Amino acid sequence: MNFYINQTIQINYLRLESISNSSILQIGSAGSIKSLSNLYNTGSYVEPAPEVSGSGQPLQLQEPDTGSLVPLQPPGR
């Protein structure tokens, strides 16, 4: 037997301390929550990462790219 529930919810103020990658924010009713995990290649990598040095020597770091593919909000507020 399936039940279909239609709800109208009005939220005037919602304060969240933190939400991480594995958090679920549920508002309303749900019979079941199905997990979903997506892995995206946002850096357009075409080969695996280099092997980690076992000698304990620090690895040479490259300069970070100054351009961002993700539009970020400017600091402030």
UniProtKB/Swiss-Prot annotation:
A biological process from GO? sporulation resulting in formation of a cellular spore
Please report a single Pfam family linked to this protein: GerPB
Keyword Chloroplast tagged: no
Q: Where is the composition biased (Polar residues)?
A: 54-65
Q: Which UniProt keywords apply?
A: Germination, Sporulation
Give a yes or no for keyword Disulfide bond in this entry.
Answer: no
What positions belong to coiled-coil segments? none
| InterPro entries per the UniProt record, alphabetical | GerPB (IPR024255)
Where is the region Disordered? 48-77
Q: Which domain of life is it from?
A: Bacteria
Q: What induces it?
A: Expression is sigma K-dependent and negatively regulated by GerE.
Record's function text: Required for the formation of functionally normal spores. Could be involved in the establishment of normal spore coat structure and/or permeability, which allows the access of germinants to their receptor.
From the Swiss-Prot or TrEMBL record, give the protein name. Probable spore germination protein GerPB
Protein's organism: Bacillus subtilis (strain 168)
The encoding gene is gerPB
